[in-house]
Regions:
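Boundary/entry segment of secreted carbohydrate-active catalytic domains
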Residues: 38-79, 94
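Active-site cleft segment of glycoside hydrolase catalytic domains centered on the general acid/base Glu
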Residues: 58-61, 66, 100-258, 267-272, ...
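Aromatic-rich peripheral "rim/lid" segments of glycoside hydrolase catalytic domains that contact
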Residues: 89-93, 102, 291-300, 304, ...
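Extracellular/luminal regions of secreted and cell-surface proteins that mediate adhesion/ECM remodeling
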Residues: 368-506
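Active-site regions of enzymes building and remodeling cell-envelope glycoconjugates
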Residues: 70-74, 84-98, 104-109
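Hydrophobic faces of well-ordered beta-strands that scaffold small-molecule active sites
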Residues: 52-54, 73-75, 90-94, 126-128, ...
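Short helix-terminating capping/connector loops at secondary-structure junctions
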Residues: 47-48, 160-162, 194-197, 269-273, ...
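Sec-dependent, cleavable N-terminal signal peptides
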Residues: 1-37
Length: 506
């Protein structure tokens, strides 16, 4: 078995029970070694899709990922020089191991190797741990994870201020696992006297049974995700969510967990940050049957894949979603896996490296999607001056955030300009045009301009973003945004509202 698999051992606990349910014999084997495929593909690099990703567990298929339309991948480690065929995005992962000595953990890569990896992957999205809630994976208590995250967050940010650092990657967004994350937030605040910083959150979205296997490992229901380490000795948590095999590909459960986690983010002060679904799929092999006697055939797996793709592409929420991505609930997602034939959902044959029926379905789904760029100003604001003037002009700093909610990994260019008044009705430009270059999936850039000699009054300040020549914007109705700015001459006293972080109750 391959060490980087995120859910290997806890599912293997189920195998005896599952064979009885299926009424047959499952042959489980590790993917054999195979020839590496060339780092080439037949797809235009401008066509790969940033939302669609893959968990690559065998390096020989990475060169073929763009042919699926996939725009990013992760491989449960952090490589210094990862393959990036056609400019595909790579998300490195810091892996942890519990340690009996202080600080309670070790991690890989570390030291010089980690510094070199950070330097070679500027601006990367760093996933800090893989399933820290799993007794079979990184297996950290909440206190230890908080300590480990603090070290890695500041280490990565110090080496590369443009890096994005992302916590989480729990197996599934169930109540016991959200309680585990609550304990992490509380522990972080207690240890470091500040809320846990994050540039986004990552989760996995399997639908697995939760039973405390430390209590009775022989219990037939002891399969799936188990219970996080913090709760294994807690009699109140003998069970979490209990499911059957027939439930493991139910779309409504999948959707509920996305909604639940987005609500959790909002309630904990992370509203609107990106959400990355960094692993999901159908784990049970094709010859297993659920409680209704239905096997996990390629057709069944493909149906689940298509339904989840449909949902994540379309799901938005103006309160919970990411404002930099037209309020979408999920920014990027990753299917398990390329070649791990121990489990279902395999996209490539591990020997021939040719697409399977599931891989063909993935490629067919992405092939018919429109390739889109969608630039828009997310916000317009002003600062740098006193809101009260004695009648003299002030100098204001105008700010905006420009986002691209399109679906392409390849970055696109646009020009941005501020105006006093509507640009379509004779508005006067403020400062020079500024350029941005952004990938899709909610990538954004903040811009500012100095506006000198502004007399007292009320102003409608506009920001307009214009795609570069040759780039078609999918939605031209959102290329302009407006903000009201007031330079006053009279006092109005208003109460001050402060937002404080309160650790969640246990």
């Amino acid at each position: 078995m391959k060490e980087y698999r995120t859910t290997l051992l806890y599912v293997l606990l189920a195998m005896v029970f599952l064979v009885l349910v299926a009424g047959g014999t499952a042959v489980l084997y590790a993917a054999p070694n195979s020839q590496a495929a060339p780092e080439t593909s037949t797809i235009n690099p401008d066509d790969i899709l940033c939302r669609f990703g893959v968990n690559a567990v065998e390096g020989g298929t990475v060169g073929s990922l763009p042919d699926l339309g996939a725009g990013w991948y992760m491989n449960f480690t952090a490589q210094s020089n990862p393959s990036r065929p056609e400019g595909i995005e790579y998300m490195p992962v810091i892996r942890f191991q519990p340690s009996p000595v202080s600080p309670g953990y070790t991690y890989t890569p570390s030291g010089t190797a980690l510094q070199q990896t950070i330097a070679n992957n500027p601006g990367a999205k760093w996933l800090v741990s893989n399933e820290p809630d799993s007794v079979w994976q990184d297996n950290l208590t909440a206190d230890v994870y908080a300590r480990a995250y603090n070290e890695l967050y500041h280490l990565i940010k110090s080496a590369d201020p443009t890096a994005r650092v992302v916590p989480g990657s729990i197996i599934q967004a169930t109540p016991v696992r959200l309680l585990y994350l609550d304990r992490i937030l509380t522990s972080y605040y207690n240890q470091f006297h500040t809320p846990l910083p994050a540039d986004g959150w990552s989760i996995h979205n399997y639908i697995l049974n939760e039973e405390n296997c430390a209590v009775d490992p022989g219990e037939p229901g002891c399969w799936g995700a188990d219970i996080p380490r913090d709760f294994r000795n807690d009699p109140a948590w003998l069970y979490g969510e209990v499911w059957g095999l027939k439930d493991t590909d139910r779309l409504e459960i999948f959707v509920e967990r996305i909604m639940r986690f987005r609500q959790w983010m909002a309630n904990r002060g992370y509203r609107g940050l990106p959400l990355y679904l960094t692993e999901y799929g159908v784990l049970f092999p094709e010859d297993y049957a659920d409680e209704n006697g239905q096997k996990f055939t390629p057709a069944r797996v493909n149906t689940f894949m298509n339904l989840t793709f449909n949902y994540m592409r379309a799901a938005t929420d103006p309160v919970l979603g990411d404002p930099n991505d037209e309020y979408r609930m999920v920014q990027q997602w990753s299917w398990y896996s390329t070649t791990d034939v121990t489990y279902n959902g395999v996209l490539f044959d591990p020997i021939t490296l040719q697409p399977t029926a599931i891989g063909t379905n993935y490629a067919s789904y992405t092939a018919v999607l429109n390739r889109e760029v969608d630039f828009y100003p997310v916000s317009v604001s002003a600062g740098g001056f006193s809101a009260l003037s004695q009648g003299e002009p002030v100098t204001a700093t105008l700010r905006t955030r420009i986002a691209n909610s399109g679906n392409l990994t390849a970055p696109a260019a646009a020009a941005v300009r501020f105006y006093n008044g509507s640009p379509s009705s004779g508005g006067v430009p403020i400062g020079p045009a500024q350029n941005v270059t952004l990938s899709g999936c909610g990538e954004f850039q903040s811009l500012s301009v100095t506006w000198p000699n502004v007399p007292p009054g009320r102003y409608s300040v506009y920001v307009q973003v214009t795609p570069a020549a040759g780039i078609t914007d999918a939605d031209t109705s959102n290329n302009v945004a407006m903000g009201q700015i007031v330079v006053g001459t009279h006092h109005t006293f208003l109460p001050t509202v402060q937002h404080l972080f309160l650790p969640p109750e246990q």
